[in-house]
Amino acid sequence: MHRQMRRIKQQLSHEAAVQVMREATSGVLALEGDDGYPYAVPISHVWTDECLGGEDEFIGRIYFHSACEGYKIDSIMDSEKASFAVVVRDEIVPDEYTTYFKSAIATGRVHVLEDDEERLRGLRALAEKYNPGQQESAEKEISGALSRVAVIAFEVEELTGKQARELASREAKASRVE
């Protein structure tokens, strides 16, 4: 599955790529859709450091929530392979004919959670990210919606991050100064 990044100097460290995933408020989940065509859907998410040991090891987990039926759920049920891309910076620089960007892409396996404890863990993580410090109202919302919402777990097997070479150059200069 892994391919070497062509522009290696623009590659983010694993820790920086995780930070990009944490900071992003939305991304695009890519699945295999009907007739083998890609299906990509914008969606809110939360990155967690949960992982398994042993042969099923993965490097992080991303949670999403969704309606219980629809194209996204059908696609997940048909194929567990997926990717998820986020962009936290996308600054157009007209004078340089470029953009200053910072992004990350996760590749792994996705599934709809059945266990209520796992579903609650995912919904609580989403609530804390998007409504920090509102635990009481979040619990009320979650308990009222639990039977009507699907919670999706994306087990990240590979994570890569990339940034514009201009940003990489700035960061390299800054670290030499320190």
Predicted regions and their residues:
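Short, basic/aromatic recognition patches
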Residues: M1-V28
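Charged, gly/pro-rich active-site loop segments
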Residues: H2-R7, R89-E178
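A generic structural signal for nonpolar/aromatic side chains embedded in well-ordered alpha-helices
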Residues: M21, S75-I76, L126, F154
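Short gly/pro-enriched beta-turn/loop segments at secondary-structure junctions
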Residues: R22-A24, S79, L146-V149
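Short beta-strand segments
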Residues: A24-C68, F84
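Broad gene-expression machinery/nucleic-acid interaction feature
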Residues: S26, A40-P42, K81-S83, F101, ...
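Structural motif
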Residues: C51, R61, K81, R109, ...
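Helix-adjacent hinge/juxtasegments
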Residues: F64-S66, Y71-T99
